[in-house]
Amino acid sequence: MKRLIPFVISMLAVPLIGGDLHGKVAAHGVRNSADAVVYVDRIAGKTFAAPSEHAKIDQKNMQFVPRVVPVVVGTTVDFLNSDALLHNVFSPDACADRFNLGTWPQGQTKTFTFKKECFASLLCKVHPEMDGFVAVLPTPYFAVTSADGSYHIKDVPDGTYTVKVWHPKLKATQKSVTVAGATEANFEIAK
């Protein structure tokens, strides 16, 4: 019995790991199913602190890389310029405080902290063909789809949630999903 008590106490100290939410998003009206953000909208009674580690978006070959980045509200994003020319990052969106980081050369990084839930567009005043997006979300349970539409969100607590899908060019969708262990949820989105 004396050996059992420490074991039981140690098991209580181990955090419970949730299930995995996975599936595919079929995106109609675009070249492929990449760049959709699949996320658990809210978990009743829980709020999530932003991670101390910054998210990173590079400006490389005159593109934002990655093009779509989901983060939790309060996350700071580092914007690196890897190109041998000047770049600028700004967002015209009010939810992102219409920030403008100015212009900077290769090898330098500027940062911005996203304080409100939103889908913020990223643009470059020097190169108007560049665009990117930051999805600022209420939970850390999110994924960006690959070109075939597949996604995988790890460690989602068991429960029933509204799972939403957002894409830069398509109409958002949502549905109720009950996560219990490994759970599959598929979506379709279109213009």
Which residues does each predicted region cover?
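Bacterial N-terminal signal peptides
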Residues: 6-15
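Positively charged n-region of N-terminal signal peptides that target proteins for export
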Residues: 1-4
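Extracytoplasmic copper-binding redox domains, predominantly the cupredoxin/blue-copper superfamily
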Residues: 18-191
